[in-house]
């Protein structure tokens, strides 16, 4: 935790008691409680991940490590795997993301992109020499894909089990390919066979070379609005539902998507226009820095429309309670909790659409 008064970073011990959702914070250096044990309902077990930032009574705590017993309990056999959503209709993306999250996977990295032949050859090296390989390569490289890093116990095997067999017709009921696949080629998604393969593919898809992403971000920074899915949306499991609502609307499509971790200083800079306008400015910044968020570049299908103004209507007013009364079909009416945890941020001013998208997909993407 950064102590502004002392101008230093303090190392603390956070103890979480899941049976009554209480917390205790100890300053081990000074040998005293910074916070005596008290119930704190906003903190969820799912938020206690190494690398996350949690907000305890307006104090931002960065989780750097955990005790051996905690690691054994929470992270036993936990793995990362690489998942690739193949070129499917955008209207299906939300359903697929919802399926993934309901199966108990945590999404820790995510972005859309287009892959080249070299990446595709590496991805399908297990079918090298097959007559079908050129067809597979052509299919996977001509459309847009979404790459995901999924975390769960025994994630590599679990993801392949969730996918089902290659042919959707013979895949087990309830598997992803049985639900949404068309044939052996258009079978929704790809999974790695080994941990080593998953690690290599994650590096290829999300890695950087000389400061440039190997798979470029898809943002165009033209005629667009910015939409940020706030951290609580990810914790609540509503990412897929919001993506589906946007993609199935008649007016909009998502041209770029990526997951980010936002520092408090960046959140303050991004929301600076609201500093002297909204009394909840500080709380907005803290929430955006609490955990991972998902940034979208949203565009209108009809170029004659003002994308920012039209998309703001889909999101609804900032207060979810007001949305539920006046705009019950809006995103914030469905998934917002209060004026801070109101599901999404959307660009307010028409001239700020490109600037806000640039902040995430240029500045933060290369930070």
Segments from the language model and where they lie:
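Non-catalytic terminal and connector segments of soluble metabolic enzymes
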Residues: 3, 20-21, 53, 59-60, ...
């Amino acid at each position: 935790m950064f102590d502004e008064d002392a101008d230093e970073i303090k190392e603390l011990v956070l103890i979480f008691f899941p049976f009554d959702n209480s917390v205790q914070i100890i300053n081990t250096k000074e040998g005293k409680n910074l916070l005596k044990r008290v119930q704190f309902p906003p903190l969820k077990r799912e938020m206690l991940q190494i690398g996350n930032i949690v907000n305890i009574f307006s104090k931002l705590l960065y989780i750097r490590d955990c005790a051996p017993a905690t690691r054994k309990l929470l992270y036993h056999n936990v793995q990362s795997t690489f998942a690739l959503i193949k070129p499917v209709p955008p209207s299906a993306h939300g359903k697929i993301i919802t399926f993934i999250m309901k199966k108990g996977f945590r999404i820790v990295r995510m972005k859309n992109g287009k892959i080249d032949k070299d990446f595709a050859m590496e991805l399908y090296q297990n079918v090298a020499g097959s007559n079908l390989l050129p067809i597979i390569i052509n299919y996977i490289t001509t459309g847009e894909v979404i790459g995901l890093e999924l975390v769960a116990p025994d994630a590599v095997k679990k993801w392949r089990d969730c996918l089902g067999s290659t042919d959707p017709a013979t895949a087990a009921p309830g598997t992803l390919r049985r639900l949404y696949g068309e044939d052996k080629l258009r079978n929704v998604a790809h999974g790695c066979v080994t941990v080593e393969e998953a690690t290599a593919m994650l590096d290829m898809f999300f890695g950087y070379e000389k400061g440039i992403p190997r798979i470029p971000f898809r943002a165009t920074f033209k005629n667009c609005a910015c939409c940020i899915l706030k951290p609580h949306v990810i914790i609540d499991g509503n990412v897929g539902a919001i993506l589906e609502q946007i993609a199935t609307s008649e007016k909009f499509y998502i041209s770029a998507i990526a997951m980010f971790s936002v520092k408090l200083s960046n959140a303050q800079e991004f929301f600076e226009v609201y500093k002297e306008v909204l009394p909840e400015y500080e709380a907005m910044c803290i929430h955006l820095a609490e955990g991972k968020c998902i940034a979208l570049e949203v565009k209108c299908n009809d170029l004659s429309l003002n994308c920012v103004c039209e998309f703001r209507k889909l999101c609804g007013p900032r207060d979810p309670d007001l949305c539920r009364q006046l705009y019950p079909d809006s995103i914030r009416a469905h998934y917002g909790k209060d004026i801070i945890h109101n599901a999404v941020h959307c660009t307010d001013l028409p001239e700020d659409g490109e600037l806000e998208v640039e902040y995430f997909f240029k500045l933060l993407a290369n930070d």
